[in-house]
């Protein structure tokens, strides 16, 4: 856990290095907190996801990949901290030893295990941390931003038998600036559940999606110059 956190911090800090000299020469400033209606965004992405649970190793890697869809709406409250409500899901695939298992579709793999397939959704809320802005300072023209997140929500299956379970979410958004209004996102995400779909004591879902984010107006942050403090003794001498 500590090694993983250290890796994230080092990776985020590394994106600051090329612009460090430029930022050191820039005028010192802070940013104003905008109104509640500012810095809202909507994002969407498509990709692939994989279920991890009982007998998941009984199917080949490619056979376990399922289509994935991401949709999210959120707001940045500061350049470094944001919240979002998100949907992830579409479909999941697995393997079962019996034709009577949940979501078994009748067909079999070459090893005799039955194919599983079900429609699912994961509704969750996340806390977003833009480490590029937090560690390197706010820069509205930054091309790449490193944004890990963590959250919780409810995972459900739309296929019979319908199941639902609380889940913990975590992931990483690699954000590439396309324009003041649009970003390209490459998102790596994970979901951890307890005995939700396949009967395992712990189950999970991992996915990778590519998509875009549209940022509504008013977007960005207003810079406020930082006024240096002058000691009272110097003021008296003036």
What are these regions (language model features)?
Residues 54-60, 95-102, 139-141, 159-168, ...:
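Outer-membrane beta-barrel translocator domains and adjoining extracellular loop/strand segments
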Residues 20-74:
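Short glycine/proline- and aromatic-enriched beta-strand/turn motifs that initiate or cap beta-hairpins
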Residues 94-99, 177-238:
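Predominantly the C-terminal beta-signal and adjacent terminal strand-loop region
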Residues 44-48, 71-75, 125-131, 150-154, ...:
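Residues on the lipid-exposed face of transmembrane beta-strands in outer-membrane beta-barrel proteins
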Residues 1-33, 219-238:
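Cleavable N-terminal export/targeting peptides
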Residues 79-166:
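Gram-negative (and chloroplast) outer-membrane scaffold detector with strong preference
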Residues 38, 63-67, 119-123, 144, ...:
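Residues that define the transmembrane beta-barrel architecture of outer-membrane proteins
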Residues 28-39, 80, 133-146, 178-181, ...:
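Short loop/turn motifs that connect adjacent beta-strands in outer-membrane beta-barrel proteins
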């Amino acid at each position: 856990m500590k090694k993983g956190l250290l890796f994230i911090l080092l990776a985020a800090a590394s994106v600051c290095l090329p612009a460090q000299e430029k930022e050191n020469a820039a005028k010192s400033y802070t940013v104003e907190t905008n109104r509640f209606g500012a810095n809202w965004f909507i994002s969407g992405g498509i990709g692939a996801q994989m279920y991890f649970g009982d007998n998941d190793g009984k199917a080949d890697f490619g056979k376990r990949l399922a289509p994935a869809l991401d949709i999210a709406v959120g707001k940045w409250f500061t350049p470094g901290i944001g919240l979002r409500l998100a949907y992830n899901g579409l479909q999941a695939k697995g393997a079962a030893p019996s034709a009577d298992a949940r979501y078994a579709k009748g067909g079999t793999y070459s090893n005799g295990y039955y194919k599983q397939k079900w429609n699912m959704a994961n509704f969750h809320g996340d806390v977003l941390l833009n480490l590029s802005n937090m560690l390197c300072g706010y820069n509205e023209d930054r091309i790449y931003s490193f944004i890990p997140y963590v959250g919780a929500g409810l995972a459900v299956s739309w296929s019979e038998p319908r199941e639902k379970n609380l889940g913990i979410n975590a992931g990483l958004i690699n954000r590439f600036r396309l324009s003041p209004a649009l970003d390209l996102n490459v998102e790596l995400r994970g979901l951890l559940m307890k005995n939700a779909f396949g009967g395992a004591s712990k189950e999970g879902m991992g996915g990778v999606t590519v998509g875009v984010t549209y940022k509504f107006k008013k977007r960005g942050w207003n810079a406020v110059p930082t006024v240096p403090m002058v000691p009272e003794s110097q003021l008296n001498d003036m």
